[in-house]
């Protein structure tokens, strides 16, 4: 599986983005429905706004797709991402786009609107799952039901773009679905062994997974939302979070290892002093070495080790 990482040389100011997209919009109708590879095999140009979606596209489409991932760096804060000229170019040329929605990757909507194409199929995961626009947690890939739905939708879209390979894409989606079984088993085992395990977090990056395993997140939603949105939590919220560690009310502390600041460092220090294991969750799929399935299994096993053996995992 090969997924191209799109890295812009520099952030593109809003005005310049509009100018570039205006040019792209004129050129867009000339893009062919399929791209020829060096071997002569025609491949569909596809884009995943996030690396995890690009990875799933690649698994479904196999040799018939050329996939690019936009947000793909597990060492940066995805909330600070800015589109570069290269990003606009790649998205404008795509025939299939998978994006998260819920405002997480709104730059994609701007690019698509400025470079419309009747050939492009856009899968907005928020809309695919029927979620309202005011849904509070955009980290949809941690929800076990998300990627099977994405895989089916990707297979259908690819089948429309290349009808001759529709059966191949359907088989890819079915294989992907089966490959999630070890993760779902790990979730079920964790839920059965540690029902309602009390945990604390910095933000909701892994909240869907915590819900799936039946854990009780005692961190106030206000603190999670403030941290996610780059807002300083109130002193009352911080004091309550501190008490979760000092009074040993939680068994694990989970934090977003891509977004750490002095407050996160303070929580980590408190957890360590009180003997509470910590788990660093990734907001972006770590690469190389992982696909979506192995990433989710690794995160789930990190939580299991923390609960069962009091072992911390801060890096995959």
What are these regions (language model features)?
Residues 7, 14-17, 39, 171:
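Feature targets compositionally biased, intrinsically disordered low-complexity regions
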Residues 1-9:
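N-terminal secretory signal peptides that target proteins for export/translocation
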Residues 15-29:
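Bacterial N-terminal signal peptides
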Residues 10, 17-20, 42, 64:
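Compositionally biased, intrinsically disordered low-complexity regions
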Residues 29-316:
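Extracytoplasmic metal-acquisition and chelation regions
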């Amino acid at each position: 599986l090969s997924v191209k990482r799109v890295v812009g040389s520099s952030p593109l100011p809003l005005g310049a983005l509009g100018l570039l997209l205006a040019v792209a919009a004129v050129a867009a109708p000339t893009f062919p429905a399929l791209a020829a590879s060096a071997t002569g095999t025609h491949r569909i140009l596809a884009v995943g706004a996030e690396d995890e979606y690009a990875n799933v596209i690649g698994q479904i489409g196999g040799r018939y797709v050329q996939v690019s991932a936009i947000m793909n760096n597990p060492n940066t804060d995805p909330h600070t991402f800015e589109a570069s000229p290269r990003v606009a170019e790649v998205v404008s040329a795509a025939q299939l786009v998978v994006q998260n929605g819920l405002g997480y990757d709104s730059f994609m909507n701007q690019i698509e609107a400025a470079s419309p194409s009747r050939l492009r199929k856009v899968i907005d995961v928020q809309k695919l799952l029927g979620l309202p626009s005011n849904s509070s947690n955009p980290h949809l890939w941690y929800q076990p039901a998300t990627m099977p739905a994405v895989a089916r939708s990707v297979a259908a879209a690819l089948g429309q773009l290349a009808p001759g390979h529709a059966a191949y894409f359907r088989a890819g989606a079915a294989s992907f679905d089966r490959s999630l079984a070890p993760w779902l088993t790990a979730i079920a085992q964790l839920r059965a062994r540690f029902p309602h395990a009390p945990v604390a977090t910095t933000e909701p990056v892994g909240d869907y997974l915590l819900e799936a395993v039946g854990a009780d997140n005692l961190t106030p939603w206000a603190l999670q939302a403030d941290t996610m949105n780059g807002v300083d939590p109130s002193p009352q919220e911080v004091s309550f979070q501190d008490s979760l560690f000092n009074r040993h009310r939680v068994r694990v502390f989970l934090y977003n290892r891509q977004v750490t600041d002095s407050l996160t460092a303070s929580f980590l220090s408190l957890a360590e002093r009180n003997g509470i294991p910590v788990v660093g969750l990734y907001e972006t799929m770590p690469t190389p070495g992982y696909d979506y399935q192995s990433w989710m299994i690794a995160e789930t096993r990190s939580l299991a080790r923390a609960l069962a053996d009091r072992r911390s995992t801060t890096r995959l």
